[in-house]
Every structure is written in structure tokens, then in C-alpha cells.
Swiss-Prot record:
Role of this protein: Catalyzes the irreversible beta-carboxylation of phosphoenolpyruvate (PEP) to form oxaloacetate (OAA), a four-carbon dicarboxylic acid source for the tricarboxylic acid cycle.
Family label: Belongs to the PEPCase type 2 family.
A GO term for molecular function: magnesium ion binding
Name listed for the protein in its UniProt record: Phosphoenolpyruvate carboxylase
Enzyme Commission numbers on file: 4.1.1.31
A Pfam match: PEPcase_2
UniProt catalytic activity: oxaloacetate + phosphate = phosphoenolpyruvate + hydrogencarbonate
Keywords: Carbon dioxide fixation, Lyase, Magnesium
Designated gene of the protein: ppcA
Protein species of origin: Archaeoglobus fulgidus (strain ATCC 49558 / DSM 4304 / JCM 9628 / NBRC 100126 / VC-16)
InterPro entries membership: PEP_COase_arc-type, Pyrv/PenolPyrv_kinase-like_dom
Quaternary organization: Homotetramer.
Length: 471
């Protein structure tokens, strides 16, 4: 059974999880989290992330040794999935050999569960981030098959390696391509089809990012690009099971226990991610009910995206990117005081600016948290470029556009315009979607603005709790 709900480790939560030893989750906290995700939240998949962070390579052993009664009757790989996100050696040269190290986990973990009498591989899929070609996916698949599992066929001093170290199983894995930029999203179907043909697969899981495209191209353009990729995938001659990476912040997808419209917005998506804010910034009962709804959601045909929709996306993307230079200074000024929620390696993204400049910005969660903390929702950036005709075209393909924008606008603080002049964007957004501020959030962001160069960490968290997400 293909999972419907994938829990992830994205650090977008304002509240501290009930099982955490401190406000920054460490490796042991994340092992506990994986158990609670399956046992309490009833998710059917947990992403185990080796990209950009130190992850515990002994996760399978630790889960079974600590929670044997639970997992012995509900085996990993069968009732629940643990799916690793591995580094992409084509992009992350400094982490290239970590790919080999993480793939070695797979047969080692299988050995451990077999020693307990469980005859099912706990891990048999990996996610490849920043996929840009079919060859990248094929290389990971072939490397595991030929050099990880395949080493058992080699001979050492006249003896097969498998006779010495045991079998290396499973013999093959599947690789889930993760598409994160515009060009790869536009080629997602082509790349997926080539990989499926090469690997002789009749079905394939494909992962589409929503957060990084929004960071690079803006809220509306990212949504249209993802919808175009989903439509193209639906036209393939193989069964595809798309995964959509969505956060609770509208800019990053808008999926929360209080907003399940995303299930209808992307009707062909099979698996939705639930990130940390979804799990920890809402009442437990609401989270459980929302996850149940997501697991039961009926799939329908993808929305058709035509050339007019893509032209509007390009226009709004260009408007968004023109404004990034004036936003970067305040984002970087505030970002260092956004509280950390996970033990991650420092990672500063490079935003490719349209005139060849490179503007340094933090990752998407911190970017959004920095702007929301002063009452500047990132969803409005560039919206002044939207004509009435553009608006009508967007509403054709983005069904809950008004609802998402009204939600974002409720968190706007006009005082933020004194820090970053986006007055034209605000006025156009107000004209299209109205402006009814959340008074409690307005008050909290006023406090942050008054103390903007001081110790604002607690205020940032308090504002995040009111929103239902940090960033």
C-alpha cells in the first residue's frame, strides 16, 4: 500500500513537541518522533532526512529495540514506511560520499529485522533531492544495485563476499525523484518516464516541492508550476503516485489541520507531507482528524494548465524576483534571531537574481518566519503585477487562491511598509482580497517591530503560535 501521509522533519513549528528534551530536537528526539508519528498521529510514512542535517544511521535498530511490541506486529516497510532523503552528489559535492554511507544502511537494517524474525525490508525507497535529470536517478538506483547489494557477488580470496558477510538485501531499491526548481518541474514527467522505462517500473512515486519553488519564484508561480507538473505526470502511460511537499504557511503550501482545502486543490496528489507545524502547533485531536481526512481523500484528475496560465506565472515570477533585493536586507537582519527547532547543518541558500547578481537568503522556513514576524506575508510579494485578467486566469487553475490570500492578508501589519516598501503590493492585495487584520497577531508584530534590533526571540515564537506555524 502506497502511503497517503508522509511526516517530515521540516523545522517550521513554533511550539515544542511534547516528547522533546529541549526546544531544539536532537537525534534521540527524532527517533522518539518517528515512533509517535506512527503510533499516535497515525501517519503511514516518515521521511528520514540525511540532506543538510546529521541523521541517526541506526534508526531502524533504535525503533525496534525501544518499541519492539509495536513494530513487531506492524513491520516497517509493510505497515509503515521509513523513507530516506539522501544527498544528491551532482549538487552537493561535499556530501557526495554520504550517499554511499546512507545506502549501506539499507541492507544493514534488513539484517537487523531479519534477526528478529521479520522478513520484510524496512527501507526500500530513497528520495533524491534537487533532481534535474533521469541520469541522476538512474545512477543512485544502479549504484545501490551494483555496488551496495551487488558487492555480495564479488570474490575475496576465493570466497564470495555474501558467504563471508551474508546476503545484501534487498537486491534493488526504488528512487523517488524530488523536483525543486522550475525547469525540473516542467520536465518532471519526461524525467520520471525515462527512469521508469530504464528501471522497468510500471508505477512510480514522484516528489514535487512547493516550498523552494515559492522561495525562488513566488507564491502564485510556484503553485502553477506544480500544477503543470502534476498534469503532465497524469498523462504518462504508467501509474504515478505524486508526493507534494507542503508546509502550514500559505506561502509554503498552506496545509494545516485548520486548512484541508489543499486536498481538493491538488486532487491528483497521492501523498501529502505533514511538517512539524502541522503536528505540533495544533491540538492533538485536530491533528489526528486531519491526518485521517488526508488518508481517506479521494483522488481525482489533475487540473489542466495551459500556456496562458504559464505566461501569467512567468510574469508574476519576474515581479517577485525584482522585489527580492529590497527584501533581502531585512530578512537577513531578522533571520539570525529566528529560533532553531532541529539540529541542522548551517545552510545558506543562494538566490539567483535575474540580473546575474546573487543575493544571500536563508532557507524558506526562516525566510517566511522573518517576514511574518514583522507582519509582512511573503504571499503578497509581487502581487501588484497581477492584472484583472491575470487574476481571472489564476483563479481558473488555483481554486482556493482567494482563501489562501485572505488568510495571509489577515496577518499583515501596515507598519511593516515602513521597513520594506511594498506598498503597491499591499494596495493591490487589499483591492483583490480585502484586509481584516488578526488583532492579536497585529499587536504581537507591532511589539517585534518596536524591538526589531533587540531580543525578539520569545516574541517571534509567540507570533508563530498565534499563526499556527513559525515559517
Amino acid at each position: 500500500m502506497v502511503p497517503r501521509v508522509m511526516s517530515t522533519q521540516h523545522p517550521d513549528n513554533a511550539r515544542i513537541p511534547f516528547f522533546a528534551a529541549s526546544e531544539v530536537l536532537n537525534g534521540e528526539d527524532e527517533v522518539r518522533e518517528a515512533y509517535y508519528v506512527f503510533s499516535h498521529f497515525k501517519c503511514d510514512e516518515q521521511m528520514w532526512d540525511f540532506e543538510g542535517k546529521e541523521a541517526d544511521a541506526h534508526i531502524v535498530r533504535k525503533l525496534l529495540s525501544s518499541y519492539y511490541d509495536f513494530f513487531s506486529s506492524r513491520p516497517l516497510g509493510k505497515d509503515f514506511r521509513l523513507t530516506m532523503r539522501v544527498p544528491n552528489p551532482e549538487i552537493e559535492k561535499g556530501e557526495a560520499k554520504l550517499l554511499a554511507e546512507t545506502l549501506e544502511m539499507i541492507p544493514r537494517s534488513y539484517d537487523y529485522v531479519r534477526s528478529l524474525g521479520i522478513e520484510h525490508p524496512p527501507i526500500f525507497e530513497v528520495i533524491l533531492p534537487m533532481t534535474r535529470s533521469a541520469e541522476e536517478v538512474m545512477k543512485v538506483h544502479a549504484f545501490y544495485r551494483d555496488f551496495v547489494a551487488g558487492k555480495g557477488r564479488f570474490e575475496l580470496l576465493g570466497e564470495k563476499v555474501s558467504d563471508w558477510l551474508g546476503d545484501f538485501l534487498p537486491e534493488e531499491i526504488k528512487v523517488i525523484p524530488l523536483f525543486e526548481d522550475r525547469d525540473s518541474l516542467m520536465r518532471a514527467a519526461e524525467i520520471s518516464e525515462r527512469y521508469a522505462e530504464w528501471a522497468e517500473l510500471d508505477e512510480l512515486r514522484v516528489f514535487l516541492a512547493r516550498s523552494d519553488p515559492a522561495m525562488n519564484y513566488g507564491f502564485v508561480a510556484a503553485t502553477i508550476y506544480v500544477k503543470k507538473a502534476l498534469y503532465d505526470l497524469s498523462q504518462l502511460g504508467i501509474s504515478t503516485y505524486p508526493i507534494l511537499g507542503v508546509g502550514s504557511c500559505p506561502f509554503r503550501g498552506g496545509f494545516s489541520p485548520k486548512n484541508l482545502s489543499v486536498l481538493d486543490e491538488f486532487p491528483s496528489v497521492y501523498t501529502f507531507t505533514v511538517q512539524s507545524a502541522f503536528k505540533y502547533d495544533y491540538e492533538f485531536g485536530d491533528v489526528r482528524r486531519a491526518i485521517k481526512r488526508a488518508k481517506e481523500a479521494a483522488r481525482r484528475k489533475s487540473d489542466y494548465v495551459d500556456e496562458e496560465h504559464l505566461q501569467v506565472a512567468e510574469k508574476l515570477k519576474d515581479g517577485y524576483r525584482r522585489r527580492i533585493a529590497k527584501i533581502a536586507e531585512i530578512v537577513n537582519r531578522i533571520s539570525s534571531r529566528i529560533p532553531r527547532r532541529r539540529m541542522r547543518k548551517l545552510h545558506v541558500g543562494l538566490f539567483g537574481y535575474s540580473r546575474g547578481e546573487e543575493i544571500k537568503l536563508p532557507r524558506a522556513i526562516t525566510f517566511c518566519a522573518s517576514l511574518y514576524s514583522i507582519g509582512l506575508p511573503s504571499e503578497i510579494i509581487g502581487i501588484a503585477e497581477m492584472s484583472d485578467k491575470d487574476y481571472e486566469a489564476v483563479c481558473e487553475v488555483f481554486k482556493n487562491f482567494d482563501g489562501m490570500m485572505e488568510s495571509a492578508m489577515s496577518l499583515f501589519n501596515p507598519e511593516s511598509l515602513k521597513i520594506v516598501d511594498l506598498s503597491m503590493d499591499f494596495e493591490r492585495a487589499k483591492e483583490l482580497f480585502g484586509y481584516e487584520p488578526d488583532e492579536r497577531h497585529l499587536e504581537k508584530t507591532n511589539e517585534i517591530i518596536k524591538q526589531i534590533d533587540g531580543d525578539i526571540k520569545n516574541l517571534v515564537v509567540e507570533a508563530g503560535i498565534l499563526r499556527g506555524f513559525l515559517g
